[in-house]
């Protein structure tokens, strides 16, 4: 029980004081004069000049008031002065009224230790459990506060925004990889089967052809160095790849990708792209039977480049809320996905800077591989640029879906190509043997005629016909074999995977999906944070007056010192450990008041 003096003077009993001895709320003042003026302006129920307090020994301090109990029904607060404390004002709660007789009432009270000693105790750095904090910085950006509140926020999210981002808009790249070159370099004679080793991130022996195209089947205008190139349609490119003799069975991989590992200059409105002539060259794949196919050949790439896509303000699209913490995880989350089984969740507050930027990396490998990472995510400011780039890989979406285009193995073309020389040799041999057989039989017939042997002449003539007939039959048999092969259905040696589904349905690049908790829970949590602030869990000086209307403060084993008795000091510590709202404006308890940071 708080210490009570033996007597008091200038006792004033008030009504309409809006807080009680549960110490959930109190009025917090900047000066003793402001404090006195506040209470002295309250409606007076009764005034006593001098009185002695009774019941102190029993722990039930009270005064006798010469007034009917009905006249004191609304008495809730009392102040008095004591000459032993330099005329200090003591502030008290009226706790109970007791009927004595028709003209006398016992008024029980207890000392309001907060108001009585408000300017006599001081906080030292203490462990702050929760309090009202600064929510926004000078640029109106939410300050990071992700301490778990332990509150229910529901089990489902509302999707508030879905945006698709592709490295080059509608532009895609078909990458064709062959065992050997399928074209002749300008000024040189084409050599089938020529291995063209080069640098593609690393030394390698394969030949790479890059064919840009759009969803509608058209192709962009391409500039390589200073030369303009109009590449063929993707369908024409594919058609020729599987009909030209030196291309059949030469292709080892064929896939579609959004990014080839180079931050090329691309103008989406003009549908033009520019490539460096040190890396690429314009080529024509052709033979003597089919039209030329304009495409792009990879000469050399020593190092790949990343491309940065700025998706805009990281907190855009989320519901406006005066509570900045509701923009933090888990109340808001951004998901980056390609809808192909690759997905990462991003906590927006850990993205350095105001905008969410995605870094795209890729390559011209034997299959598709593109990564999408969040720039400067969880990256300390002490890291260098290259270190930040590497660190972002830890939070990347890796799309290594094959995106293959089906490769057709035309058995007839392959047979003709692989056996071209032997087939010609067989034909020549058959014809030569047939002719020689005819000549031999012809000489035999002439000899028989010279000797007058009619049987010999007839036999040799029959041999001539037989030799010629056998040659024709052998050639016909060889052609029949080719016809049988031609009737064999073309086989898929490499399936197209889900490329048609993914690209046909527009699943390209990545999607940035913003999600937040349901409105019901947003409202519940907003009201809670508005009333009780945020968890702090820091040793610091408490925020006793940082808001316009009220501050909530809760401590643990708080460190308070002051020039007052130890019993009251301990009670003050207990009050702050239990949590109390310090009101700076009236009406006390009105949470609709403007409570902006001051």
Swiss-Prot record:
What exactly does this protein do? Distal (knob) tail protein that plugs the end of the tube before DNA ejection and forms a channel perforating the host membrane during ejection.
| GO CC annotations, alphabetized | virus tail, tube
Q: What is this protein called?
A: Tail knob protein gp9
**GO biological process entries:** symbiont genome ejection through host cell envelope, short tail mechanism; symbiont genome entry into host cell via pore formation in plasma membrane
Q: Which Pfam families match?
A: Caud_tail_N, phi29_gp9_C
The text of the family note is:
Belongs to the picovirinae distal tube protein family.
The annotated subunit structure for this chain is: Homohexamer; forms a hexameric tube structure with six flexible hydrophobic loops.
Q: In the UniProt record, does the keyword GTP-binding occur?
A: no
Which of UniProt's keywords are assigned here? Late protein, Pore-mediated penetration of viral genome into host cell, Viral genome ejection through host cell envelope, Viral penetration into host cytoplasm, Viral short tail ejection system, Viral tail protein, Viral tail tube protein, Virion, Virus entry into host cell
- Compartments, record wording: Virion
